[in-house]
């Protein structure tokens, strides 16, 4: 039995639904929401690599590497902002993030 395109698409769909489920179930913690969004982005990247491999084209795989690089940078910046926010406010609850003033 070989692993085909359908298997990769099923795994990506499960990851994407898990990410959506994580966002809807836990709306109070910003870190869990950020991790759920990253999980959804990972599912999209798995789809791009699977279709790229299935079609025999490397462009999707190269584009996925760029997307993963940008996603790592945005996750690092997002966590740094959350650390600074926690130091100033003492909490990272979603309802407290809405009352920020510039």
Curated annotation (Swiss-Prot):
Q: Which Pfam families does the record cross-reference, listed alphabetically?
A: Oxidored_q2
UniProt keyword list:
Membrane, NAD, Quinone, Translocase, Transmembrane, Transmembrane helix, Transport, Ubiquinone
Q: Which reaction does it catalyse?
A: a quinone + NADH + 5 H(+)(in) = a quinol + NAD(+) + 4 H(+)(out)
Q: Indicate where this protein resides in the cell.
A: Cellular chromatophore membrane
The keyword Cell membrane appears for this protein:
no
Observed effect of gene inactivation:
No functional NADH-quinone oxidoreductase complex. Cells lacking this gene have a nearly normal respiratory growth phenotype on lactate, however they are unable to perform anaerobic photosynthesis. It is suggested that in R.capsulatus this complex may function in reverse flow under physiological conditions.
What GO CC terms are in its UniProt record?
Answer: NADH dehydrogenase complex; plasma membrane; plasma membrane-derived chromatophore membrane
**Residues of the signal sequence?**
none
Q: List the GO molecular function terms.
A: NADH:ubiquinone reductase (non-electrogenic) activity; quinone binding
Q: What is its EC number?
A: 7.1.1.-
Q: Which residues cross the membrane?
A: 5-25, 31-51, 66-86
Q: How does it sit in the membrane?
A: Multi-pass membrane protein
Q: Which InterPro entries would you find in this protein's record? A: NADH_UbQ_OxRdtase_chain4L/K, NUOK/Mnh_C1-like
Q: Which GO terms describe its biological process?
A: ATP synthesis coupled electron transport
Task: Tell me the disulfide pairings in this chain.
Answer: none
Which family would the database say this protein is a member of? Belongs to the complex I subunit 4L family.
What PANTHER family does the entry give? NADH DEHYDROGENASE SUBUNIT 4L-RELATED, NADH-UBIQUINONE OXIDOREDUCTASE SUBUNIT ND4L
> NCBIfam families, per this entry?
PRK05715.1-2, PRK05715.1-3, PRK05715.1-5
On subunit structure and binding partners, the annotation says: NDH-1 is composed of 14 different subunits. Subunits NuoA, H, J, K, L, M, N constitute the membrane sector of the complex.
Name the UniProt record assigns to this protein:
NADH-quinone oxidoreductase subunit K
Which species does the entry assign this protein to?
Rhodobacter capsulatus (Rhodopseudomonas capsulata)
């Amino acid at each position: 039995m070989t692993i085909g395109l359908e298997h990769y698409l099923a795994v990506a769909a499960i990851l994407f639904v898990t990410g959506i489920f994580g966002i809807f179930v836990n709306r109070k913690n910003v870190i869990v929401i950020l991790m759920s969004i990253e999980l959804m982005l990972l599912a999209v990247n798995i789809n791009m690599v699977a279709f790229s491999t299935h079609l025999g084209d490397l462009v999707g795989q190269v584009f996925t590497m760029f997307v993963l690089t940008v996603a790592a940078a945005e996750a690092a910046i997002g966590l740094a902002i959350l650390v600074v926010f926690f130091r100033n406010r003492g909490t990272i609850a979603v309802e407290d993030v809405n009352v920020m003033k510039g």
